[in-house]
């Protein structure tokens, strides 16, 4: 999988139904190849929800947006779009969910079409973490999510497990953090999430590790909350 594809799994977050907290926050992303900060914003629209992230520096610009509905079961994805423009990579991709035909379609750099079960929750890299926060809020310590395969289409299952409860530092204050690990059968990649209880389980830090790299996303400033 392309290394920049991993960025899409970082820039996300929210709640569920009436517990959804709208917010705007600044995050810092660091890897061996790039360091960039940007604004992530979650808000309710007249016809659903929107979660987006926008960042830029002298070598790259990034834009991610997920549009979706939330019902009593969870997230219902509508569309997901990415635009990444480092000097050494141009990547545009649009994912559309057709729930009448039960088809997921991708256009842009990766073009494919996949079918899915009508009542199946298939999440994109952004709204996946809405489901994560839902489960953590409900004190579920182990669960799985079906994420779309951005390159080839279809659904991939990822497993999540709470591994610890610790104190985290943010803005000169201590927060109760749930430490959550994400793994996939047959892969050495591991993603660790640090979710702050006092901030409705907002993501304070995410560390993505494999044998080849370590990527890190960290909350720097909350611009608005609630």
Describe the predicted segments one by one.
Residues 14-15, 40, 110:
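Compositionally biased, intrinsically disordered low-complexity regions
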Residues 4-14:
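Sec-dependent N-terminal signal peptides
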Residues 18-99, 140-226:
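Acidic, serine/threonine-rich low-complexity disordered tracts
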């Amino acid at each position: 999988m392309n290394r920049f594809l991993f960025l899409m799994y970082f820039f996300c977050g929210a709640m569920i139904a009436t517990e959804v907290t709208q917010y705007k926050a600044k995050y810092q992303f660091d890897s061996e190849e790039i360091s960039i900060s940007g604004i992530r914003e979650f808000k309710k629209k007249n016809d659903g929800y929107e979660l987006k992230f926008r960042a830029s520096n002298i070598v790259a610009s990034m834009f991610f947006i997920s549009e979706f509905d939330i019902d009593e079961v969870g997230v219902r994805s509508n569309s997901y779009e990415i635009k990444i423009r480092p000097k050494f990579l141009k990547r545009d991709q649009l994912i559309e969910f057709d729930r009448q035909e039960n088809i997921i379609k991708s256009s842009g750099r990766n073009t494919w079409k996949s079918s899915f079960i009508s009542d199946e929750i298939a999440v994109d890299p952004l709204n996946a973490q809405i489901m994560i926060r839902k489960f953590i809020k409900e004190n579920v310590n182990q669960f799985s999510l079906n994420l779309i395969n951005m390159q080839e289409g279809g659904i991939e299952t990822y497993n999540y497990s709470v591994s610890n409860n610790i104190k985290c530092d943010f803005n000169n204050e201590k927060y109760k953090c749930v430490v959550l690990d994400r793994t996939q059968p047959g892969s050495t990649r591991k993603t660790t999430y640090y979710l702050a209880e006092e901030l409705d389980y907002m993501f304070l830090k995410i560390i993505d590790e494999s044998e080849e790299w370590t990527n890190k996303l960290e909350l720097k400033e909350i611009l608005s909350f609630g």
